[in-house]
Swiss-Prot record:
Top-level taxonomy: Eukaryota, Metazoa, Chordata, Craniata, Vertebrata
Family the entry assigns: Belongs to the calsequestrin family.
Source organism of the structure: Rattus norvegicus (Rat)
Post-translational modification: Phosphorylation in the C-terminus, probably by CK2, moderately increases calcium buffering capacity. N-glycosylated.
Location of Phosphoserine modifications: 398, 405
Keywords from the named record: Calcium, Glycoprotein, Metal-binding, Muscle protein, Phosphoprotein, Sarcoplasmic reticulum, Signal
Quaternary structure annotation from Swiss-Prot or TrEMBL: Monomer, homodimer and homooligomer. Mostly monomeric in the absence of calcium. Forms higher oligomers in a calcium-dependent manner. Dimers associate to form tetramers, that then form linear homomer chains. Interacts with ASPH and TRDN.
Location of the protein in the cell: Sarcoplasmic reticulum lumen
Leader peptide range in chain numbering: 1-19
Residues that carry a glycan: 335
Official protein name in the record: Calsequestrin-2
Chief place of localization: other
Function of the protein: Calsequestrin is a high-capacity, moderate affinity, calcium-binding protein and thus acts as an internal calcium store in muscle. Calcium ions are bound by clusters of acidic residues at the protein surface, especially at the interface between subunits. Can bind around 60 Ca(2+) ions. Regulates the release of lumenal Ca(2+) via the calcium release channel RYR2; this plays an important role in triggering muscle contraction. Plays a role in excitation-contraction coupling in the heart and in regulating the rate of heart beats.
CDD domains associated with the record: PDI_b'_Calsequestrin_C (cd03074), PDI_b_Calsequestrin_middle (cd03066), PDI_b_Calsequestrin_N (cd03065)
């Protein structure tokens, strides 16, 4: 929310400053482009736009803070609608109370959610509610679900995408029934998972793919795994991706950060903080990659990598909540329910753990030897010790009072 406010204020101030041509940041022009969606105008709106961005919200209350928060989100949507006005994307809002029947018809249940209607699909946006993130998300959605790789330079560009899941298939041509099944499968995961295809034998040979074969690339892995039992139907591809879409090592991204955080293993995340642009952070990330590659067959291991540079407004919150210093690499286990956490002791930046030491620590986490409940017990023990100390103090004071009483009796005698 702070980011939204700063963004709006920053854009407002920029409107009063001079800028060279070609660097004029967009500022809200005051024109209303976001409309209220109802049963009456639903068909008309759906026919008009290729893509419909829908914000499903609770009724606006009389609370001033809640009103300001709603207004800020509305301004963000207006700015995004203005920037993408030429892209034939509609922007609407649905009041959960006024349009309860419509919400039920569309399958919306979670207030405060942002949905995108594309064809017959509904895609939920589960990322940071910020103008730049939303614009990038929507632009990715209007692109073709499959990107074609035809030459060596495009292969190099493909290979440089290392921090996200990607698939690449080799097909005869665009009319191939297996390519069409691949396209249909890609639509299920757009824009979160990238699908690529090639019709070039030279590209396929370089990537070690046979006809109608699809390679599945896990983030940060050296080699892909070939999906078995080719050729595939749409349903088979979708099922395989769903079964393997939790990588051994994955980044937290603004566009799907909440969905990723909710995708925990038994209520916990193994979280690693490392700045890729920092030498120590880069070194630590390379160690994490090695650990992930050595343990990619372990279904119980999933490490969530967070680059603090991607979330500047959350750094102070994370440091306070987890009681850690994010100016140096960190790795810990976090309980997603109450944010309790336990962190590996890293003495200093010059003494980062080796891959073997990290693996030993992770094994202790997976076995339950290291867990956040132990941290709670230690806190309770500390509280108990403090209580006992207080009791001891009370006993001492009581003894002193008794001694004073005896002295008084002697004086009376």
């Amino acid at each position: 929310m702070k980011r939204i406010y700063l963004l709006v204020v920053g854009l407002y101030l920029l409107s009063f400053s001079r800028a060279e041509e070609g660097l004029n940041f967009p500022t809200y022009d005051g024109k209303d482009r976001v409309v209220s969606l109802s049963e009456k105008n639903l068909k008309q709106v759906l026919k008009r736009y290729d893509l419909l961005c829908l914000y499903y919200h609770e009724p606006v209350s009389s609370d001033k803070v809640a009103q300001k928060q709603f207004q800020l989100k509305e301004i963000v949507l207006e700015l995004v609608a203005q920037v993408l006005e030429h892209k034939n994307i509609g922007f609407v809002m649905v009041d959960s109370r006024k349009e309860a029947k419509l919400a039920k018809r569309l399958g919306f249940s979670e207030e405060g959610s942002l949905y995108v209607l594309k064809g017959g699909r509904t895609i939920e946006f589960d990322g940071e509610f910020a103008a730049d993130v939303l614009v990038e998300f929507l632009l990715d959605l209007i692109e073709d679900p499959v990107e074609i790789v035809n030459n060596k330079l495009e292969v190099q560009a493909f290979e440089r995408i290392e921090d996200q899941i990607k698939l690449l298939g080799f097909f005869k041509n665009e009319d191939s029934e297996y390519y069409k099944a691949f396209q249909e499968a890609a639509e299920h995961f757009q824009p979160y998972i990238k699908f690529f295809a090639t019709f070039d034998k030279g590209v396929a040979k370089k990537l070690s793919l046979k006809m109608n074969e699809v390679g599945f690339y896990e983030p940060f892995m050296d080699e892909p795994s070939v999906i078995p039992n080719k050729p595939y139907t749409e349903e088979e591809l979708v099922e395989f991706v769903k079964e393997h879409q939790r990588p051994t090592l994955r980044p937290l991204r603004p566009e799907d950060m909440f969905e990723t955080w909710e995708d925990d293993l038994n209520g916990i995340h193994i979280v690693a903080f490392a700045e890729k642009s920092d030498p120590d952070g880069y070194e630590f990330l390379e160690i994490l990659k090695q650990v992930a590659r050595d343990n990619t067959d372990n279904p119980d291991l999933s490490i969530l990598w967070i680059d603090p540079d991607d979330f500047p407004l959350l750094v102070a919150y994370w440091e306070k909540t987890f009681k850690i210093d994010l100016f140096k690499p960190q790795i810990g286990v976090v309980n997603v329910t109450d944010a309790d956490s336990v962190w590996m002791e890293i003495p200093d930046d010059d003494d980062l753990p080796t891959a073997e030491e990290l693996e030993d620590w992770i094994e202790d986490v997976l076995s339950g030897k290291i867990n956040t409940e132990d941290d709670d017990n230690e806190d309770e023990d500390d509280d108990g010790d403090n209580d006992n100390d207080d009791d001891d103090d009370d006993d001492d004071n009581s003894d002193e009072d008794n001694d004073d009483s005896d002295d008084d009796d002697d004086d009376d005698e």
